[in-house]
Every structure is written in C-alpha cells, then in structure tokens.
C-alpha cells in the first residue's frame, strides 16, 4: 500500500486548510478532495486541478456560504475565493443512451461512499478530508500500488465515455507501468459491442484524444482503443491502418498501424507540441485506402491522405492549427525524407509551401514530425536523420536574401519576387554545398 502524506505536507494539505479558513468558521461544511488531485499526489505526480465533493449540504446552504452555482445537469458550485469546483454528493441512474443518459439524485442523505461508487476507476474514487484522512472504500490505494486501472462497479458499462477515459489514463500512467485490468478491458469491449460509443459527440471524442496527446505515451491511448475494439468506431481512419503492409526494406515493422503507434511514441519523445503529436499520428492515413493490389507500395498516400485528414478533422472538430500542420506533414513528408536528392529550387518550393517566411516556427514542427516518422520504425529508432539539418540550413540560407537589397539593385514590381526566388535558390545551393563539404 502506498504511504499517505501526513497533515504537515504543505504542498497538498496546507493550502487546503487555508481554503477552509476563508469560509465562516461555523459553516459545518463536509467537503472532500476527490479524483485526480488525490490520485496524483499519492503517485507523486503534479496536479493542477482540484475537485471537491460536498456531503450533507443543499444548494441553498452552498449559496449562503458564498458559493456560485454553475452546474446545469447537477449542482456544482464555485468557491467564492479559489473558484474551485465543489459538487454536491450525488448518485446516478442510467435512464437513456450515451454518456448523458443519466438521472442524478442529490440530497443531504447521499453519503461519500455512494458518491465515490459512481466514479469510473478505483484510483479515482479516493477522497481526503481537511485533516488529511483518506477515504478509500473501493481499494484504490491497492490498485495504485499494484499499478492497475480497475473499474469501481458494474455500472462502469453504463457510460461509453469511460472507454476513452480509461485509454487516456493508460496513456497518462503508462510510464509508471499501469495496465488495464482484464475484467475492465472486457467491460470496455462490452460497451463497444453494445453500440453505445455511437452516442459520443464529436466534441467529447476530440476532448479525450486531445488530452491524450499531452500524456507521456499518446500511442497507448490508440493501442488501448484498438485492443477493446473502440478505435474502429471513434477513429476508423487510424484503425484502417492496422493490417496494411509496407515494404519491409524501409519498414521492418511492416504493419502500418504498428508504424503509426511507433511514430506517435517518437513524436512524444521529440516534442511537447500537441499539434506535432497529432500530425504524427495522422500523417500516413492515405495508406489505409491503398488498393490491396498495390500493397506493400503506397505511392499516392501523400495525396490520398489529404482528403481523409480533412474529413476526420471536420468530423471530430479538430482545431485548424492541428489540421493545417497535419495536412502539410502528410503532403510533404516524403519530400523531406528525400532531402539528400532535392534540387535547390525544390527546397525553395517546399519552404514556400510551408509559408515559413511568415510562420518560422512551422518548419521545426514539420521537421520534428518527419524525424518521428523516420525513427518510428522497428530497430531504426536511433538512426540519424540528416534531412532535418539540410532543410534547416536551406531555410537559414534563403532567409538571408533581403528584399531591400533587390530593390536597391533596381528591380521593381513582380520582378522583385522573381529575383528573390532566384537568389534564394542560389543561396540554398551554396549553403548545401558547404554542408556537404564540412
């Protein structure tokens, strides 16, 4: 069992007492810190959000204490000073389809144990009071110690969103060797087979996918969804990559789906940028529609993938920043991989395509995606990627060509742009020659 921090732990308990002191001394409020804040503290992980459950109170009592009501479907209140969410203890009963098909019951007689029972995983069903005492009726501490993600009760199957949440927690805690309990994975598969995932809104799918991108292992989110069958429902474009072969000469892992997971892992190692991690996961979607008669070759995937990415982003409502980077990586990653063969004019065309003159940070993002693609191959994870340096040198050389010098030489109108392109190509050629000879 994991050790519990004492009441002298100022990073966790001390500031909670300060919050209590900001309320009337005789308020009698029974509130407990719950969920991720307790879980992450027990795992020695930084936690930035704190949620509270309040037992034995009514909405009127909360408002009398200065809390502001914000909940629509059930009573949630914001603390008058910290603005942290406080929810009245409640129970839930399945009344319809999807993750919103629940009837909530809240009243002063709902116990802490009853409230914790409605939560998804045992490690999220631990509460702590203002004295530092832990309440763990569903043995979440043991599962923390055993590194297991386990459902609290059979009611787990009633909420399809939990499939994505468990996959995200698996990605978040994979570096600590957490695994999904077999019986919980069975329940996730049961949810998939029930058809309940179809009731998830695009916003909720993207919300969980987006959160998974910020975890240490985003690829685990996809692999867990694949294992329980959910990937084919919520992200069929990625699911279609599994079982599609690639040339073994370039891809010892062969399977495009496995390659995608490896690229996702490498992208997370190379960059904290969520758009970069997203683009890495979807850059090869075109391979999923290559006719079997052409396997294992995928000559058109850089082109066919564009339409798929656009439709995916529209369906799941992916932000434009993510979509735009993904489209550029999809279209141009093969060109970047061939940097050792490109002419100076082709380098320039690619740089212009990226609009690096107005968006200089974009080049590094794209190159990191391509580096992740290069490293995301079985046995080749540590292979050098000189293509990145070649494009960086080409960009810096072209950047030195100044318009004012061209104007000073007498060029006007559209001739300025044409001369700039010529000089940039020449500068790139010279810079790459120097790089080759160094």
Indicate where each model-derived feature is located:
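Catalytic cores of the polymerase beta-like nucleotidyltransferase superfamily
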Residues: 1-438
